[in-house]
Amino acid sequence: MPVLIESIGNLERRLTFSVPEDRLESHVDERLREIARTARINGFRAGKVPAKVIEQRFGEKVRAEVLDSLLRETLDSAIRAHSLRLAGAARIDHANEGRLNFVATFEVVPDFGEIDVSKFSVVRRTARVTDVDIDQMIENLRLQRRTWRVAEHGAQVGHLVALETWSQAGDERLPIEGVEAGSTILGSGVMFEQIERGLEGLSKGDEKVLDVTFPDDWRVTQLAGKAVQVHVKVIEVSEPVLLEVNEEFIKSFGVKSGKLEDFRADIRANLERELKGALVSHLRREVGEQLIAAYAHVEMPPRLVEKEARLMLAKQIEQIRLSGRDPTGIPDDAHIGFMDAACKRVLVGLLVGEIAGRNRLRLDPMRVTETLHLIASTYEEPEEVFEMYRNDPKLMEGVQSLVMEEQVIEWIADRAKKTEQVLSFQEAIQQ
């Protein structure tokens, strides 16, 4: 049967083809002879098992494996011969006539026309980790391990205040009866800023009425956009007790030597990794937005977009489960809400592949190795994690895709109009 290609949509194709029966049988016979040379079956010496027994024992499985291999090989050959560029995996079904006739249905990459990235504008941000950043991180680590003791003076920024509150908004009282118990660290923003400022200087047992105007988008709808009297009573004020940066403290973060210089070196490496990730993410987002704006008119493969939307939904459902919530109430068609974002993801992904192909960009193996080391370094046993990735094709495929995307994004940025911007570490990671 000759290969037949049909267009069944703007981007969907149907390819009808067959696997030659003589080729299938030849490959099956060859594979069965290989098995016969080493097969061990009770009642027969190794290598002396009759061909009929080998056929009965292994024939069905071998034929299925060989057919699958030839099926893929024949399809790939037909796709190459007709210069088709698939935008996802093909679905293969048996044709109505003949056991070795098949129909492959798939979507193709759309025609993007000329891709001119010289019109793009990017901001090349640079930043570096300083000793001040390391000092700040050490202080943050001390704060994470802090304990509390009762303060003998009024509350200050950084103090933990336990309190009871009730609010009066016109004729409405919240709560209707009693009070609400809560706590906040002054300056943390856990409570509304005007309330936290009003608590400064208060001690245990103090009561105060605060005049507060809440913004229109305040999370408590009954208070949003209203001038409210908030009645507060301080139950307790506690001040933080920070651990000393000594050998014990340093070792608790996995620095075996317990030395301050090694601790600072580890922190620097972690901050530099975080900084690099932030700069790359910002550039990826900036370039991605311009790719989307420039090629939003190009139709995307609908099945590929739907698949991406379902993957995004599945990820959200998994996050819901991990948070301890029940996702069973999510409707079956919830993926529709992700279709727009999925379309943009597919667009950027296909453009990245198209740019890489047109400009013969090749995956940099050294960069893949560096990325693997970077990922592994965030774990307690980096060598084991590195080998785990190396030996898992699916994990490696994800890393390789990430690296290839970064290479293409940088290729685009190098050819776009550039503005240089020097940032501090904090500015870089917060943008």
Curated annotation (Swiss-Prot):
Subcellular location per the Swiss-Prot or TrEMBL entry: Cytoplasm
EC numbers on record: 5.2.1.8
Keywords linked to the UniProt accession: Cell cycle, Cell division, Chaperone, Cytoplasm, Isomerase, Rotamase
Chief place where the protein resides: cytoplasm
GO process annotations (BP): 'de novo' cotranslational protein folding; cell division; chaperone-mediated protein folding; protein transport; protein unfolding
GO-annotated molecular function: peptidyl-prolyl cis-trans isomerase activity; protein folding chaperone; ribosome binding
Record-linked InterPro entries: PPIase_dom_sf, Trig_fac, Trigger_fac_C, Trigger_fac_C_sf, Trigger_fac_ribosome-bd_bac, Trigger_fac_ribosome-bd_sf, Trigger_fact/SurA_dom_sf
Domain of life, source organism: Bacteria
Catalysed reactions, semicolon-separated: [protein]-peptidylproline (omega=180) = [protein]-peptidylproline (omega=0)
Keyword flag Chaperone: yes
Transmembrane spans: none
Recorded coiled-coil stretches: none
Family to which the UniProt record says this protein belongs: Belongs to the FKBP-type PPIase family. Tig subfamily.
The name this protein goes by in its record: Trigger factor
Species per Swiss-Prot/TrEMBL record: Xylella fastidiosa (strain 9a5c)
Gene: tig
